Structures are given as structure tokens and as C-alpha cells.
Regions:
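Acyl-donor binding region in acyl/amide transferases
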Residues: 1-43, 90, 146-210
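A structural detector for beta-sheet-dominated domains
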Residues: 28, 54-56, 86
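Structured beta-strand-rich cores of soluble
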Residues: 40-60
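Conserved catalytic-core motifs of GNAT/GCN5-like acyltransferases
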Residues: 50-51, 209-222
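Positions that flank functional sites
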Residues: 93, 194, 218
Length: 223
């Protein structure tokens, strides 16, 4: 504690984090219990300085304005190359596509071991971006908690850049709109401070902002 007191820069950083806007999130007890052992579960998730995206319901609103210019450019590149994104109908179909990408990544084996089929009370949405020949370029998975969701997997094919990079932007835009149109209001993507510079830039272009989170667990039968 003494070293913190003697470091004015650290004190300013801590104060800035403490003063971030707070997002209140309500989660059902059944969902909180179903994900209690997961690193991103509401009961275990860090509350301070989290990357949060306010989910859009309309594409034209989400992509409007100068802050989204770079995102619009990346989406145009993906579209010109015939990249398409969609929601997988089953875990098995998604994992088959994801495995193609994982085999081309040095971290693929380790990541694949963490991508088990969800439990019966765990609600997950799966997404895949493909090139014009239907080859997988990027994949993502999102845990669903009603009015919010948690992005816990998103990777692209390392051997097919830059198209795989553009596909990642398209895939995220697709899933954000899909979730927003389904009634979810916020998408959480982990710490806003611990990500790599590349991921922080990716999140910035997509509209994520650092926010503090406050969870309320709603017991069964609560309105």
C-alpha cells in the first residue's frame, strides 16, 4: 500500500478507473449458477474497467458517423472479397468450422481443449465467417444472459490475412446486430486494460468502452 501512496501516476489511474460509468446488469439465478465455474461467469467476473459494447439494433445507426469510418472500410473490404457471416445452427457445425481455423494456429490445440459443448443450462450462440468458397475465416462464441451477453471466444485464421482480419470485423458486426435485435443490450468482452494493443484497437473501432459493472442476481420468481 505504501508504494501505491508514493506513486501519483498510479493513484490517478486508480481514481480514473473508479470514476468510470457504471453499467447495471441483472442476471437470473439459474444463469448465474449455470456459469458459476466459468472464468467469465457473473459471480467471478471482474467488476472494474471492463470492455462493454452497447449493442445496436439497427445497422445504419451502428455504422453511422466518423468514429465508425475505419470499421465501414474493413466491412467493405470483407464484402468485396465475398466474405459472409452467420450464426451456426448447432455446436457441432460450429466446432467443425472452428477446428479448421484452430489447426492453423499455434495456440489452436490449447484453445480447442477449452471449447467443450455447453451444459444443458448454459445458453450459447455460435458464429462463423467464411470466404467466397465457404472456407472458415473466423469464429466466435457468446454466452447469453438475457439482457447482456459475454464474448468468450473470437479467433481468425492466421494464414489467410488480411481477409481473415476483415472477416473478424464483419463477424463481430454481424453478431452484435444479431444480439441487439434479439433484445440484448450489452456485450462484455473482458478487461479493457489487460488486452493486447491489437485487441484494444479492435475493440475501439467496434465501439467498446471501459465501464465498471454492477451485477444483480435475480432469484427465481422475481419480476
Amino acid at each position: 500500500m505504501g508504494s501505491v501512496v508514493r506513486d501519483p501516476a498510479l493513484i490517478r489511474a486508480l481514481v480514473a478507473v473508479w470514476r468510470l460509468p457504471v453499467v447495471d446488469l441483472r442476471v437470473r439465478r439459474a444463469d448465474a449458477d449455470a456459469w458459476s465455474g466459468a472464468y467469465f461467469g457473473p459471480a467471478r467476473r471482474g467488476r472494474l474497467a471492463q470492455a462493454v459494447l452497447e449493442l445496436p439494433a439497427a445497422e445504419e445507426h451502428y455504422l453511422a458517423g466518423r468514429p465508425r469510418q475505419a470499421l465501414r472500410t474493413n466491412l467493405r473490404h470483407a464484402r468485396d472479397l465475398g466474405v459472409t457471416s452467420g450464426r451456426a445452427s448447432t455446436y457441432e457445425a460450429w466446432f467443425e468450422a472452428a477446428s479448421v481455423i484452430l489447426r492453423a494456429r499455434p495456440d489452436g490445440h490449447a484453445v480447442g481443449r477449452e471449447m467443450d459443448k455447453p451444459g444443458p443450462r448454459q445458453h450459447v450462440a455460435y458464429y462463423v465467417a467464411r470466404d467466397a468458397h465457404e472456407a472458415p475465416l473466423a469464429f466466435a462464441s457468446v454466452a447469453l444472459f438475457g439482457q447482456f451477453a459475454v464474448l468468450f471466444t473470437m479467433l481468425s485464421h492466421l494464414d489467410r490475412h488480411p481477409r481473415a482480419s476483415w472477416a473478424r470485423y464483419q463477424l463481430h458486426t454481424f453478431l452484435a446486430l444479431d444480439l441487439g435485435r434479439s433484445g440484448a443490450r450489452h456485450l462484455l468482452a473482458g478487461s479493457a486494460l489487460r488486452e493486447t494493443a491489437g485487441n484494444q484497437y479492435f475493440q475501439h473501432l467496434l465501439g467498446y468502452r471501459a465501464r465498471n459493472l454492477r451485477f444483480e442476481v435475480a432469484e427465481s420468481g422475481a419480476p
